Amino acid sequence: MEITNPILTGFNPDPSLCRQGEDYYIATSTFEWFPGVRIYHSRDLKNWSLVSTPLDRVSMLDMKGNPDSGGIWAPCLSYADGKFWLLYTDVKIVDSPWKNGRNFLVTAPSIEGPWSEPIPMGNGGFDPSLFHDDDGRKYYIYRPWGPRHHSNPHNTIVLQAFDPQTGTLSPERKTLFTGTPLCYTEGAHLYRHAGWYYLMAAEGGTSYEHAVVVLRSKNIDGPYELHPDVTMMTSWHLPENPLQKSGHGSLLQTHTGEWYMAYLTSRPLRLPGVPLLASGGRGYCPLGRETGIARIEWRDGWPYVEGGKHAQLTVKGPQVAEQPAAVPGNWRDDFDASSLDPELQTLRIPFDDTLGSLTARPGFLRLYGNDSLNSTFTQSTVARRWQHFAFRAETRMEFSPVHFQQSAGLTCYYNSKNWSYCFVDYEEGQGRTIKVIQLDHNVPSWPLHEQPIPVPEHAESVWLRVDVDTLVYRYSYSFDGETWHTVPVTYEAWKLSDDYIGGRGFFTGAFVGLHCEDISGDGCYADFDYFTYEPV
């Protein structure tokens, strides 16, 4: 069996790999998207399906007002003592010496739940993980953060003992690692194998310099020695490699005795005419940071990536029978169920009566007008990941605005300051019109402002679609679902990426979704009949 990378396409970063018997799970970060954390299941490490979105209550995750790329950073999923343990950080600040990250622990007897109410685990850092030692003791490992550490690029990894009976941490903190010159040490996990403790961590930052480092010690407190190759995995030295930004590893031994590591990676789009080593030459990644897997071999007591330390497109699978799962492809939601499809997420807050309803008009998603796409508070946006470089997304909408501050339509969204929006609104003297708007680094543009597209008075519905074609995308509209007209504006798909947006705290990926806003306060709504996503 051969595994093709990435194994989780689209925005699925910071994988935490976990095994229960012959079942395998990966938990990934969701940042400001709700519900928090996505957990995937596999029986063969090749075919994965989404089985749980555990942080689905405000009591577990309150992100209203969180900044872009705040929220859930680097969860850690483990299985011990007959239950699953999930650690996570809710980051409240991303662009200062303080993160104000709040760390929590929840548990469940089954991956589907029910998940417990959260136990606070301190606010002193991020990327926490839990290590279950062979003697039953448990340890909490994390990256501390504050003004002192922010100014020191050689960041530290700290360990504290954890008492599961009382849910408390020992006040004694032990420093395990102070980093290498790669800097930005984070995402640490502890393992025990063949009499050694192994500390695995990410370094180099979250972009193209990203890497995995490994250390080992005979004692959990250290001292730890660094891997002979320093970096166990990185793609930094191979700018032409199709899988870039590889790092943030999570190690696992299969029930057949084989070793694998999940890691995050990205597939860049390179712009024509830009030299590979020039600024921007490595490319742009609108699909965000995805999840890959590597096969691991042991030599002289150290783990190595088979085939070399770079991320590889194909990997030999474990010695198990392949268990095919649904392949990400054509997707459709007709909104006939009583809850949103698991592929759909909202921004920062749960889908409830404030945002919309699936029962007010059966067979339709009703979205109530709330804040604009620029908001970080109450926003009626329901969206799904881009998982392909070329796809078509489409919807049919019924919407009757009566004020220019009311709109509804289709959006391609990266964060609150970078998105485009094709929508129906209301113009005095004209009635309903179709427009597009783009927000680029928080700078708006309205290319159809002087000549909006009129919606015929008799049109009960407006169909909207977006066609993404690798580097560019375009919106279209129809008034009968058969005859389509292209909006005469072309947008750059590559701009909806970490790489274009830059700076600190931009770690997600492009989404496509439905949106309704009403800043007039009059309480308008839009009804969406279906939402489709089709790779092309």
From Swiss-Prot:
Catalytic activity entry: Hydrolysis of (1->4)-beta-D-xylans, to remove successive D-xylose residues from the non-reducing termini
Which domain of life does this protein belong to? Bacteria
- One Pfam match, by short name? GH43_C2
Q: Tell me one GO biological process term.
A: xylan catabolic process
| KW Transmembrane helix (keyword) present | no
EC number(s): the record gives 3.2.1.37
Q: Name one GO molecular function term.
A: xylan 1,4-beta-xylosidase activity
Q: Where is the active site?
A: D14 (proton acceptor), E186 (proton donor)
List site positions: Important for catalytic activity, responsible for pKa modulation of the active site Glu and correct orientation of both the proton donor and substrate: D127
Q: Which UniProt keywords apply?
A: Carbohydrate metabolism, Glycosidase, Hydrolase, Multifunctional enzyme, Polysaccharide degradation, Xylan degradation
- Tell me the PANTHER family matching this sequence: BETA-XYLOSIDASE (PTHR42812), BETA-XYLOSIDASE-RELATED (PTHR42812:SF12)
Task: Indicate the family of this protein.
Answer: Belongs to the glycosyl hydrolase 43 family.
Q: What is this protein called?
A: Putative beta-xylosidase
Q: Can you name the source organism? A: Escherichia coli (strain K12)
